[in-house]
Amino acid sequence: MSNKDIRVVVGMSGGVDSSVTAHVLKDQGYDVIGIFMKNWDDTDENGVCTATEDYNDVIAVCNQIGIPYYAVNFEQEYWDKVFTYFLDEYKKGRTPNPDVMCNKEIKFKAFLEHALKLGADYVATGHYARIRRHDDGHVEMLRGVDNNKDQTYFLNQLSQQQLSKVMFPIGDIDKKEVRKIAEEQDLATAKKKDSTGICFIGERNFKTFLSQYLPAQSGEMRTLNGDKMGMHSGLMYYTIGQRHGLGIGGDGDPWFVVGKNLEDNILYVEQGFHHDALYSDYLIASDFSFVNPVDLDNGFECTAKFRYRQKDTKVFVQRESQNALRVTFDEPVRAITPGQAVVFYDEEVCLGGATIDDVFKTTGQLSYVV
């Protein structure tokens, strides 16, 4: 089968990465369709939402490269599957990663299902990741060539079935080359800056945005010894290891968030970047997903990331229970945060990931959320 007989539906955001993705596929002779996903009702609140501007950029790019385009509305799916999860996690005192859930439920589920109805053989996105396809039909997900832009961390929940239908055309090149291609082709998005906001919601004042959906309750900031250091403006606004926004003056080392007490609405803080309370030895995680089978019963060694762009840490992964994993670190790790993803790697291969629930020292539970 030649490329012209293979239909690829591209998820286009109005950014330079998805624009170049569509161009590369078109240039390679594929039957390409561009789809813009509208997943957030920008009339819901007063934040600056760029959906209209982004769609106009999609139209301009699709016209430039000569492919058909459509807009599809997934607002209900996004609200039900991603945003309610996002809010529920904050209510629990955790720090969620909406991009992970957005990829799992929207970009590679709702969008993939829609694309298949359009006769797609594959979907493609502008993610910095790679797919390795084997002769027996199974696939592996690899880190993007541009290590600084690699996005496998956010794609860790994708299944073998999903990835078998996915292409990541720019995963083999770095960001500078993507910009260069966009400029050489004079694409409308060539000089557009990268978005850094919440998946599909955009860039806005996070504190103001969150307060529109969750009522904030101020409370005391205390040290682990019980000394009162001030007041916090709502536990949901703080994350483990946070330094800024605490409002604690005085001499000496900076202060950092080391824990939350949900029941008594207390934010725990301690002084010093390397305070012992910020370090842990192992974690328990749930909602785990692996691209290919792994030996959880006997356990296995690999490396892991606990946040995006973090250096890999050597770990040992084993089954804790039917629905949970225990991940033990080779050396103590700082500021691991419940609600975030732990993502596993075997060199360049992304094995999968899970959601961090509880974090422990060897001597007992670390009181990040109590």
UniProtKB/Swiss-Prot annotation:
The active site is at 102 (nucleophile), 199 (cysteine persulfide intermediate). The keyword Flavoprotein does not apply. Keywords: ATP-binding, Cytoplasm, Disulfide bond, Nucleotide-binding, RNA-binding, Transferase, tRNA processing, tRNA-binding. ATP binds at residues 11-18, 37, 126. It is an enzyme of class 2 (transferase). It holds the Pfam family tRNA_Me_trans_M. Its EC number is 2.8.1.13. Its main location: cytoplasm. It catalyses: S-sulfanyl-L-cysteinyl-[protein] + uridine(34) in tRNA + AH2 + ATP = 2-thiouridine(34) in tRNA + L-cysteinyl-[protein] + A + AMP + diphosphate + H(+). The record marks 127, 340 as: Interaction with tRNA. It is found in: Cytoplasm. GO terms for molecular function: ATP binding; tRNA binding; tRNA-uridine 2-sulfurtransferase activity. Disulfide bonds join 102-199. It comes from the Bacteria. Catalyzes the 2-thiolation of uridine at the wobble position (U34) of tRNA, leading to the formation of s(2)U34. This is tRNA-specific 2-thiouridylase MnmA. The lineage of its organism: Bacteria, Bacillati, Bacillota, Bacilli, Bacillales. The gene is mnmA.
